[in-house]
């Protein structure tokens, strides 16, 4: 599409960045990928490997939230399209395909499934799919103790913005879950 010819921008502490980098390489689209300076070298190298010559990695901010804010500002200043890491219907739907893959790999419905939560996109997508396919499966979201923003939000009954997060839990260190992801997670977890 026309909008992609200018390139794309995303922010991630790892998994989303790798997926976007892979897509940039396959589709021959230039991408700017913002990651916190605390991102482990192994994740940075994976993004570089997947994106090859089609991605620029920008390390900025101590947390995902700071890198995300910088990426959004850059996308607004440029004519590039911002690809949100989790709080977007299409991203959630795409992550829901993992739920489908899970159902294809087992002979009968699972009793329990544990899903990691950062911003809640993966838990929303997989959880929504599995809730429809296996209504009796207990879906359990797992967050690090140092950045349990979804847990705090579910307990409060609304999206909560944590004051502090532990930067050590880089891949799931999100101060605030998405509004869409919170809405889905409160129904499926």
What are these regions (language model features)?
Residues 1-7:
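Helix-rich "cap/lid" substructures immediately adjacent to catalytic or cofactor-binding pockets
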Residues 6, 80-81, 111:
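Conserved acidic residues
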Residues 8-11, 16-74, 129, 149-162, ...:
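Active-site-proximal loop->helix
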Residues 10, 59-60, 82-85, 115, ...:
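General beta-strand structural signal in soluble alpha/beta enzymes
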Residues 21-22, 32, 87-188:
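Glycine-rich phosphate/pyrophosphate-binding loop at beta-loop-alpha junctions
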Residues 76-82, 165, 186:
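Gly-rich Lys/Arg/Thr-decorated short loops/hinges at beta-loop-alpha junctions or inter-strand turns
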């Amino acid at each position: 599409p026309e909008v992609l010819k200018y390139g794309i921008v995303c922010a991630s502490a790892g998994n989303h960045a790798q997926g976007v980098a892979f897509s940039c390489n396959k589709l021959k689209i230039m991408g700017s990928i913002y990651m916190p300076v605390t991102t482990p070298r192994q994740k940075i190298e994976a993004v570089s490997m997947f994106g090859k010559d089609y991605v620029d990695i920008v390390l900025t901010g101590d947390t995902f939230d700071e890198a995300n804010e910088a990426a959004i500002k850059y996308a607004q200043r440029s004519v590039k399209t911002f690809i949100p890491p989790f709080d977007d219907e299409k991203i959630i739907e795409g992550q829901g395909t993992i739920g489908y893959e899970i159902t294809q790999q087992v002979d009968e419905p699972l009793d329990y499934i544990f899903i990691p939560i950062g911003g809640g996109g993966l838990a929303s997508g997989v959880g929504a799919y599995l809730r429809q396919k296996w209504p009796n499966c207990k879906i359990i979201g797992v967050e690090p103790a140092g950045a349990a923003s979804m847990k705090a939000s579910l307990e409060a009954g609304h999206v909560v913005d944590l004051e502090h997060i532990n930067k050590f839990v880089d891949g799931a260190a999100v101060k605030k879950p998405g509004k869409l992801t919170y809405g889905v997670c409160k129904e499926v977890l």
